[in-house]
């Protein structure tokens, strides 16, 4: 009998990606070594219906925010990603220069507070 081959990380990642897709989750895999260290291999927002036994418990809200300069709008791909987050129950938005004046992010905080209160 041949010894079993070890399961490679690549195969595990593929299974996780399939599982998340089956759950209708919005997901992405950040590029390794291209950002903040320690970020998980998979980032996802999985739809979750709040049940009576969950009332009163803290539940996280996945948030995706795209920042844009004044007069700029998200690309079609960026809008598609934001729509995916919303479809899965997360909060997605883009904030542009009008809402986030340099040096004065109080306006941005107000936009975020309003969005969270609407949920």
Each language-model region and where it sits:
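Catalytic phosphate/metal-binding cores of nucleic-acid and nucleotide-processing enzymes, i.e., regions
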Residues: 1-119
């Amino acid at each position: 009998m041949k010894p079993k081959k070890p399961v490679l990380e690549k195969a595990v990642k593929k299974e996780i990606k399939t599982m998340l897709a089956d759950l209708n989750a919005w997901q992405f895999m950040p590029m390794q070594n291209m950002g903040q260290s320690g970020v998980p291999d998979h980032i996802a927002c999985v739809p979750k219906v709040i049940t009576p036994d969950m009332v009163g418990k803290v539940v996280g809200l996945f948030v995706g925010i795209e920042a844009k300069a004044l007069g700029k709008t998200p690309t079609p791909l960026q809008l598609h990603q934001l729509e995916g987050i919303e479809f899965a129950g997360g909060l997605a938005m883009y904030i542009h220069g009008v809402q986030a004046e340099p040096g004065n992010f109080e306006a941005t905080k107000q936009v975020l507070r309003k969005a969270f209160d609407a949920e």
